[in-house]
Amino acid sequence: MRAPSTSANLGAGFDVVAVAHDAYFAEAYVAVEQGCGVAVKFKGYDPGENNTVSLAFRHLFNMLGICRQVEVVVDNRIPLARGLGSSGASAVAALAAFIREAGLKAEPKLVVEAAGLGEVAAAGSPHFDNVAGAALGGAVVVVSTSPLEVVKFSPKLLFVVGVPDVPPIPEKTRLMRSVLPREVPFKTYVAQLARVSALVAGFATSNPRLVALGMSDDVVEPARAPYVHGYARARRYALEAGALGFAISGAGPSVVALVDDKHSDAVRAALARAYAEEGLRAEVKVAQVAEGALGV
């Protein structure tokens, strides 16, 4: 079972918006037997026993009132610690594979909730935006966390994803949250509300112009930009090459540019050039909106 990479926040949609795209994917294989326990093997790396997949399974078992002996193998092709939802996609792919293999019926929201709670292992607190995108696909808006409610849209949008090859920042998510402002002026709050509304309206109508308006952000991105390698040059080059919008992907260091067909190649080349001029190796891909692991 595969779950796609995701880009959360998209500018003004901090902690509530994510889009699934086909730039990368995580794949999980499971074997289900009688008994109770979860054994997880990750191809190519070892996150330790306290990982998002194991924790997500514990939450799912509690929610369903069941327990099974599950052997999981995760093949995660999403670059790790790059702001592309790698940990959440691993958990979603594993839970979706288990539900299919065990012949269970589970509400998609339960999978999103269990995987989101599993994010505590990677980020220190629950996060539902990335996992909702990986599970449901399309563009998602987390409208409530208690109770959990997620709205999915299926917009036809095109992105260019830039992934710089830089050393991971220890406890990156915690750091990137610690730099955020604790208060904002009321005028800024109103402007941010308008931009989030533009994001949602753009998703609902597949209107890239509205989505681009929502990708402009005066609260989170200015605080995080100094910690994102090559951000200023990448943003400038992408917009000059015809990108409609530009944002940090999740907590970075990856970035995502909204493009149209006409400018996708030019923006991809511009991002690659920006990273090269910064002395950074990077992978830059054109990506479409993807379906989620649950196929809903």
Swiss-Prot record:
GO biological process: threonine biosynthetic process
MF (Gene Ontology): ATP binding; homoserine kinase activity
Subcellular location: Cytoplasm
EC number: 2.7.1.39
Classification via InterPro entries: GHMP_kinase_C_dom (IPR013750), GHMP_kinase_C_sf (IPR036554), GHMP_kinase_N_dom (IPR006204), GHMP_knse_ATP-bd_CS (IPR006203), Homoserine_kinase (IPR000870), Ribosomal_Su5_D2-typ_SF (IPR020568), Ribsml_uS5_D2-typ_fold_subgr (IPR014721)
Residues where ATP binds: 79-89
Name this protein carries in UniProt: Homoserine kinase
Organism from which the protein derives: Pyrobaculum calidifontis (strain DSM 21063 / JCM 11548 / VA1)
Pathway(s) annotated for this protein in UniProt: Amino-acid biosynthesis; L-threonine biosynthesis; L-threonine from L-aspartate: step 4/5
Keyword list, A-Z: Amino-acid biosynthesis, ATP-binding, Cytoplasm, Kinase, Nucleotide-binding, Threonine biosynthesis, Transferase
Cellular component, GO annotation: cytoplasm
Transmembrane segments: none
